[in-house]
């Protein structure tokens, strides 16, 4: 059975229900939070049954997914209470269009078996990335306090070192900055990723510091799942604490708006891991997962 959740009441019930399964449901919880606050990416939620669902998929409306090669748009967020038995639901073409280049995101590594099986059935090549999922300590305290182990918090205030404010000015990104963000984004560097970045800048809060030239020296922004992503610093201004300052500023903006604040970091990126620790971002017991699926 496929049940589309329509109307504010059902979607608010889903958000409340997903809260019980944090942090494993975080990727879907963050997305539904944004669907319930304006839904600028025109997403929809599908469940296998209601109200006692096992699996939920959040995805764009069909009319948004016109480009079969655009996995930045063709993105699905998945949470399942029963990852071993969700394959049939995920295999439905009404739930996931397996004919396109697509991307699946989830805080559940256990979905890998079902996704790999379905990709094999539909002749898709899969690249699975598993990264460290970080959540800001205040979000942990508010949403799932049982995981707040103060032993894991860095000593100190969690604030970054001051920057040279005569040289650098705190600001937000403009759509004209998308090309710069795209150039330094590990998952980007192409026309489709630039369109995605432009859409994020237009619709969600972002933070940057402008260098003496008046262009961004360091930045971070938010995507449609409510995650802080695409942080970067131009090479000549690295190792000056700018990205810590920018991420902390973005933290504050998101907290004021009531958003859950989270991000991910590659397991090999020790510099960002140290920075996350200093800002009191806590690593979660579950991972940040991405599956990029491309037809063979």
Curated annotation (Swiss-Prot):
The modification N6-succinyllysine is found at residues 16, 127, 142, 169, 183, 256, 267. Gene3D superfamilies: 3.40.630.30. Its EC number is 2.3.1.13, 2.3.1.71. Mitochondrial acyltransferase which transfers an acyl group to the N-terminus of glycine and glutamine, although much less efficiently. Can conjugate a multitude of substrates to form a variety of N-acylglycines, thereby detoxify xenobiotics, such as benzoic acid or salicylic acid, and endogenous organic acids, such as isovaleric acid. GO terms for molecular function: glycine N-acyltransferase activity; glycine N-benzoyltransferase activity. Pfam families: Gly_acyl_tr_C, Gly_acyl_tr_N. Signal peptide: none annotated. It comes from the Eukaryota. PANTHER family: GLYCINE N-ACYLTRANSFERASE, L-COA N-ACYLTRANSFERASE-RELATED. GO terms for biological process: benzoyl-CoA metabolic process; glycine metabolic process; monocarboxylic acid metabolic process; response to toxic substance. InterPro entries: Acyl_CoA_acyltransferase, Glycine_N-acyltransferase, Glycine_N-acyltransferase_C, Glycine_N-acyltransferase_N. Belongs to the glycine N-acyltransferase family. This is Glycine N-acyltransferase. Keywords: Acetylation, Acyltransferase, Detoxification, Mitochondrion, Transferase. One of its GO terms (cellular component) is mitochondrion. The lineage of its organism: Eukaryota, Metazoa, Chordata, Craniata, Vertebrata. It is an enzyme of class 2 (transferase). The gene is Glyat. It catalyses: an acyl-CoA + glycine = an N-acylglycine + CoA + H(+); benzoyl-CoA + glycine = N-benzoylglycine + CoA + H(+). The modification N6-acetyllysine is found at residues 16, 113, 127, 142, 159, 183, 256. It is found in: Mitochondrion.
